[in-house]
Swiss-Prot record:
The keyword Aminoacyl-tRNA synthetase applies. Keywords: Aminoacyl-tRNA synthetase, ATP-binding, Cytoplasm, Ligase, Nucleotide-binding, Protein biosynthesis. GO terms for molecular function: arginine-tRNA ligase activity; ATP binding; glycine-tRNA ligase activity. The keyword Cell inner membrane does not apply. One of its GO terms (biological process) is arginyl-tRNA aminoacylation. Its main location: cytoplasm. This is Glycine--tRNA ligase beta subunit. One of its GO terms (cellular component) is cytosol. It comes from the Bacteria.
Amino acid sequence: MTELKPLLIELGTEELPVNALPSLSRAFFEGVLAGLERRGIVIDHGEAKSLSTPRRLAVLLTAVAVEQPKQYRELFGPYLNTAFDTEGKPTKALEGFAAKCGVNWRTLERIRDTKGERFVHRVVVPGERTDALLPGILTEAIAGMPIPKPMRWGAHEYLFARPVHWLVMLFGQDVVEAEIMGVKAGRISRGHRFLYDKPVSLSDPQNYIDVLQAAYVLVDPAARRARIVAEIEAVARQVGGVARITEDNVAQVVNLVEWPSAVLCSFERVFLEVPQEALIQTMEVNQKFFPVLDSLGKLTEKFIGIANIESNDVAEVAKGYERVIRPRFSDAKFFFNEDLKQGLKAMGERLRTVTYHAKLGTLADKVARVLVLAEAIAPQIGVDPLLARRVALLSKNDLQSRMVNEFPELQGVAGHHYALISGELPEVAMAIEDAYRPRFSGDEIARSPLGKVLGLAERLDTLACGFAVGMKPTGNKDPFGLRRNALGLARTIIESRFDLDLKVLLDQASDWVAFATTIEQERHAQESVKQSKKEAAVKHSLPQVSDEKSARIEELYDFIVERLRGYYADKGIPTTHFNAVAELKPVSLYDFHRRLDAIGRFAALPEAEALAVANKRIRNILRKAEIKIPASVDATLFDQPAESGLLVALEGVITDTRSALDCKNYVSVLTCLARLRPPIDEFFDKVMVNDENLMLRANRLALLQRLGEYLCCVAAIEHLSN
């Protein structure tokens, strides 16, 4: 049985970049494992650990084979007809092969294959020792790491993310002889930079985590995360609050400390006059602090910092954190007060001075387009068009605020606060912020109907603009954020259950964008840039429907639907189901969703596969038809009972499902379609479609055409066929 030993590799460095640390740690771990596996060295993956702190990358494996397995090789020699001459003496071919193998030819074995009998030499190659292979494995692992900005240090030519100061390589209790980037491997690690700044001797990989913990280093990121969250929650409870803990913030802090310790801090209550989102943004993004909220979710004057030490004077540490945060809060308060002085209306007046796009006018022009779209969408989902007009008019004003200029992430949020202060209706103010949802993947859609209207109008205009000026996404480039906007638009429609005609909305958006580009062309053509839109509009009416415009609407529709492919894939929806619905191009995305749900249930029926195969067969027959197919079926031409049986069954299903189809009860429709399997099977078993009699053939093709159309009334079910 192969002997197994624990393996520890630790690379000690200066503080590694916080954002790069997770990927560096993962690549280091995977590189070491891949190197061992490539060499056939047995590893117990169940106990493999990837460990890291800001000052070290480590791989801990509890069971690694001490050597490669033996390799059994076969060297094939000449066949007998070329191995011996006519006198039965070995030829040069046989003697040369034996010499190459280092044996007498008489000791060679013989095997038989399809060409005859030949000589073979079997040899057992002992595996190399793992400790001899580890230096090369480590070198390969380091070379394969994604280092964002490699650096040199001292007089060395080595390149790494940060200077390397020590290297631990223990295989069992033995040090592996190696030298990496000018550092010789040993058993000496280092403790915490401040709490235990001295060498730490490691005798056994199995004790690594415990020995480092005694030196004030939690080398397991999961352990640091657990301690950070537990301490933050405990400290917040002490002051009767609830800590705001986001995954992004915790992930950053985990990679900033080796020995986390929560510190309660506070700031002056006067800063709470500033919108809490600005203060939270400053604490979390700029300083990696954790805000403390009250039971209603309102920000308190308390916050929590995570120190990398256990201080004897926690109050002094807290003062340091408070000194850091105070100037930033003062700036936020200044920006807020300056914005209040000018007011939301004045901010909006400056939008006409900001270019949205050279071919699309200013931000004020964009607001005008969004306003018209919002008015059109509002009554379709039960929202007051006047409110939609008002919220659209105010929607971009905060882009000219000092607050948003300093904190771009607060666009919409700042507008919400300024609208309330200006006396706008609460639902109008909320919609200004709400329309930006979803802001990122996994975020919730807008909560209020008014916010949804504005969000849809905004995204429709952005999409139409992007395509109109040739800013379609290519590869990783998406300057208008069209992919994100398309998915946000689709999610809002589907998750809100809005039965809207997407192509009509895209048509309206494209009209106004085309109008905007016409106006801009007119502006540039005139000597005076002050020519009004009214003057230009006299000369240029809204574009009429054209082939080019229709093609663009289809392109936009396809672009939006394609974004749903990944959305549904994440929900476990098979691609075949998605393709089945997408082929029909439902104009309502909510209708698309309902069809997709129904096809999922239909696919579970025992008849589904057979009907899918039948529909595929029908399509193939119709595609290959070389005669004109009548528009209707003539029952008097039937000469087989299976023909009339199929037509009767089909007409019965059509009658029984007409109401369900009108009500878009697609599950009921597809369930009824399952009744057609027996007559379809009977038809294909008993009837020759391509009969020599052209009248019979044409009539049977007409029957199949009608059947095929109804089988696809919900989705193109042939996609379900395996």
